[in-house]
Regions:
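Extended beta-strand/beta-hairpin segments
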Residues: 1-41, 48-128
């Protein structure tokens, strides 16, 4: 079993992976929804690629903000995702960071590569 999802009553769920790590989800305002968790996971997956690619640099911070548009009809799939990456540190060549983001979306980030079949994914980069 790779994942176990259990309803906790009301509008909350606990997700447990095969290593016993847990994450809580919910709906109706009682937790992060599975839809938003998917969006968070897209950002996290790609940001991991960027941070890992800069592991030999003096990176002081990295973040990504995501804006989401969904279809109006069910299933309300993701149709557009805009990602704004912000990274800072000492001697971070913008070309290198750009290449890391491009490679993340082209081949490494599993989640963005799944989502790009229904959503147009765009991004911008701010290196400070």
């Amino acid at each position: 079993m790779d994942s176990h999802v259990e309803w906790n009553g009301s509008k909350t769920l606990t997700c447990t992976d095969k290593n016993g790590l847990k994450m809580d989800l919910g709906w109706g305002g009682e937790g992060i929804s599975p839809v938003i968790a998917t969006l968070h996971s897209c950002g996290a997956c790609s940001l991991i690629d960027v941070v890992d690619g800069l592991k030999n640099r003096e990176l002081t911070y990295a973040s990504v903000d995501l804006d989401l548009e969904r279809s109006d009809t069910n299933p309300k799939v993701f149709t557009k995702i805009k990602m704004i990456y912000r990274v800072g540190g000492i001697d971070l060549p913008e070309k290198l960071v750009t290449r890391l983001v491009e490679h993340s979306h082209a081949k490494y980030c599993t989640i963005s590569n799944m989502l790009k079949h229904t959503a147009e994914i765009t991004w911008e980069l701010i290196v400070e």
